[in-house]
């Protein structure tokens, strides 16, 4: 993942 934008969970 990168940052919060990539956190889908």
UniProtKB/Swiss-Prot annotation:
Alphabetical UniProt keywords: Antibiotic resistance, Leader peptide, Plasmid
Organism superkingdom: Bacteria
GO biological process, one term: response to antibiotic
Protein name (database record): Chloramphenicol resistance leader peptide
Taxonomic source organism: Staphylococcus aureus
Lineage: Bacteria, Bacillati, Bacillota, Bacilli, Bacillales
């Amino acid at each position: 993942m990168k940052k919060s934008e990539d956190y889908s969970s």
